[in-house]
Amino acid sequence: MGTIGRRARELAVPVVVCALTLGVYCLYSVGQWRMMASPSWDLAIFTEAAKSYSQGHWPIVPIKGPGFNLLGDHFHPILVLLGPVYRVFPSGLTLLIVQNALLAWSAWPVTRAASRLAGSAGGFVIGLACGLGWGLQGAVGAQFHEIAFAVPMLAHGGVAFAQGRYRACMAWLAPLVLVKEDLGLTIMVAGLVLAWRRRDQGRRALAESLAFAAFGAVAFVITTQVLLPALNPAGTWAYSLDGSATGAGSSAGGAAAAKVWPSLIEILTFPSVKIATVLVCVLGAGVVGAASPWFALVVPTLAWRFMGSVDFYYGWSSWHYNAVLVPIASAALLDVLGRAARWRDRRSADEDRALADEAGAAAWRAERVSSWWGTGVISVGVATPLLALAATAPLLPMWQLTSSGFGQDGPRAEAAHQAMAAVPAGSAVETDITLMARMVPDHEVYWVGSAKDMDPLPEYVVVDQRSYVWGGRDVTAVGWATDAHPGHSYELVFERNGFQVAHRTS
C-alpha cells in the first residue's frame, strides 16, 4: 500500500498540470468555435486533409486547388493519424481538441522530471509554465497545425536527454521527420548536442550521435529536394529555407524572386520584436536553461523564421511558430536543474564527512559554495518561467478567457447556420474563411478563387461580407462569382446579417 500511495503522489502533480492545461485549452477552443473565430484558412485545410485520410485517400485539399495533395505543401505524413479520429468525430473542432491533448501531453514528462528535481511545488510551477507556455498558447489561438505532434516528441526527447537516457532521446525525436520538413534540421542539431554530451562515453556512443545528426540532415534534404517536389503540383518545394512561399504552393505555380540577404545583425535584431522573441524564449528556460547545450535546438526554428520576409514569423505572442520552442526550453532548464541538484545534494554527504575528521571538514567547506550555487540555480530556474508567464499573460491568447463575452454565440450565429443549411450536403462550394472549416464535413469546399480552372465549377458560393479577407471592400456573392467566372450566371438564394449564398444557374 505504501508503494501504491507513493506512486499516486508522484503522479498527482503531472495529472493535475495536464488536466488543467487541457481544460483551459479546450475551454478556449470551444469558445473560438462558438464565436466562429477563424484566424486563417489553416483549420479548414487540415480538416479537409483529415477527411480525406478518414476515407482512405491521399490528403486531397480542394481549398488549395482542385486535386491538390497537401503532402506537396508541407511534409507531414503523421497527419494520417487524424483519419480514424475524424471518422468518428467529423468536425473541425475535433482537430482543435486533438491539438489541445497533444500540447497538454507535453507537460507530462516535464512535470514529472521537474518534481523529482525541485519537489512537488517546483514541479507544478515548471510543468504549468511549460503546459501554458507562450508558444503553446499561440498555437491554440492559431488553431490546428501539424506541429502539435512535434511538441510532445520534443518534450519526451528533451527530458530523456536531461536524464541521460540518450537512446530514448533519439527514439522520441526520430519521428519528427514525419511532422514537418524543417524539423530534420532540429534533429541534426540534437545529434550534434548528443555527440558533445557523450564525447567521453566511447566511440560507439559518439558514432550513434553523429549518425543521428546525419539522419536529420539527410531527411531534410530528401523531403525538401525529392519528396515535396514530387508531390507538389508545380514540381518544386513550395517554401524556401527561410519559410517564405515561393509562389509554387498551388497548381498556379510561380518563380521565387531573387533574394537579397540582410546582414547577420539585421537578421537578429530587425525588427526589434525578434529580440523580444529570443528574450521570452530564454525566460521560458528559466534563464539558467540557456546554459544547456540542449538550448541550441531552438536555433533552426528561429533561423528560418528570422531570415524570412513574413512579419508574423518574428513575433512571440501569437501564431504557432513558437510551439516547438517551449518544450526545448523546458528540457534545457531541466538539464541545468539536474546538475544543480547534484551540486546541492553534495552538502549532506560532505557534512557527514566533516563530522568524522578534519580533512572532511576542509572538503565540506570547499564544497559548500557549490551547494549554495546549486540551490540558487534551482530557485532561479523554478521562479523565472512562472514570473515570465505571469508578466506576459495579458498579451497571450488565453487572456481572452477573462472577457465576459468570450465563447458566447454572436448575433450572427443563427444567420451563419442558416447560410450553411442553404447549401445542400454533398455540394461543391466556394467560400471565404468564416464558414470554411464548418462546411468541410458535408461539402467539397474551395477557397474563393481556387476553383477558377474547374469544369464544372462549384454549384454554390458562400460569402461573409464582413470577413477580413475582403479588406473592407463591398462584396456580394453574385457580384464576386460573376466577376471570377465570366460566362456563368448566379442567383442569390440566401442573404442575412452579412452572409450571402449564391447558386450557379449556368
Task: Show the residue positions of the predicted features.
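Start-transfer (signal-anchor) and selected internal transmembrane alpha helices
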Residues: 1-27, 166, 207-212
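Signature aromatic-anchored transmembrane alpha helix within multi-pass, membrane-resident enzymes
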Residues: 15-18, 121, 213-217, 341-396
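Extracytosolic helix-loop segments that constitute the early lumenal/periplasmic catalytic or substrate-binding loops
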Residues: 27, 45-69, 77-78
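Transmembrane-helix motifs of polytopic, lipid-linked glycan transferases
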Residues: 93-117
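Specific aromatic-rich, kink-prone transmembrane helix
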Residues: 109, 129, 148-172
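Hydrophobic/aromatic-rich transmembrane helices and adjacent perimembrane loops
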Residues: 296-355, 361-368
